[in-house]
Design a protein with these regions (language model features):
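Nucleotide/phosphate-binding catalytic cleft detector across ATP-hydrolyzing
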Residues: 2-106, 114-209
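Conserved Rossmann-like nucleotide-cofactor binding loop
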Residues: 109
Length: 209
């Protein structure tokens, strides 16, 4: 989908059924969920029960829209799970203990921050700054600093390989990228380092914090 979106001709319109963690196109979301359900559940005799992860601070209207879309896609029962709880369980964290655990789950459209204890949420919030926003800022930063146009996938690779946050104060990784020079219009290669991306990454991280 990412490759098609980057090279889409004029007669194809790209649609994002989910945006910032919530439904933006109800019809296409239903179609998307239908495909997912059919891939993993082949029985047509009994409708499946479906669990869906949602942002911690999702509104009642937004959660109702999720349930409605999944039911319309063929589910007989829908369970909504807060994304921080799902992230904690997936990481092997025991949230049933009385001591609090802070979970920061940076998704594609939203970042969920929650304090979990005794199997539930003590406090939670969602910030609509997340992975996709990092990609956009890295893309713009490379464009402005190097006069190079890169694609969304290259920006995402820079985020994962160079702009990460390991537990090493002197971390400074470098990655060679290929793009199109805005000055000559020709293909060009440059090396981008962790320190090069400090500004856009910190700007968004401060918004989350």
């Amino acid at each position: 989908a990412s490759d098609v979106y980057k090279r889409q001709p004029n007669y194809i319109s790209a649609i994002f059924p989910l945006k910032d963690g919530v439904i933006s196109d109800h019809t296409m979301t239903r179609e998307l969920i239908c495909r997912f359900v059919n891939q993993v559940y082949s029985s047509h005799m009994v409708k499946p029960r479906v669990a869906v992860c949602v942002p911690a601070a999702i509104t009642g209207i937004e959660s109702d829209a999720v349930v409605e879309a999944v039911m319309a896609a063929g589910a007989r029962q829908v369970y909504l799970i807060d994304e921080p709880i799902a992230a904690a369980l997936g990481s092997g964290i025991d949230i049933t203990q009385p001591d609090g655990r802070m979970i920061i789950d940076i998704g594609g459209g939203t970042t969920d921050i929650a304090v979990l204890s005794l199997g539930g949420k003590v406090k939670a919030t969602s910030v609509r700054v997340a992975g996709n926003h990092y990609d956009e800022e890295i893309l713009k930063h490379v464009r402005n600093k190097y006069s190079i146009a890169i694609g969304q996938r290259t920006a995402e690779q820079l985020k994962k390989n160079v702009a990460c946050c390991p537990q090493k104060a002197d971390f400074n990784e470098t990655m060679e990228i290929k793009g199109r020079s805005l000055l000559t219009g020709l293909p060009i290669r440059v090396n981008v380092s962790t320190s090069d991306l400090y500004e856009p990454v910190m700007m968004l991280s401060e918004q989350i914090g």
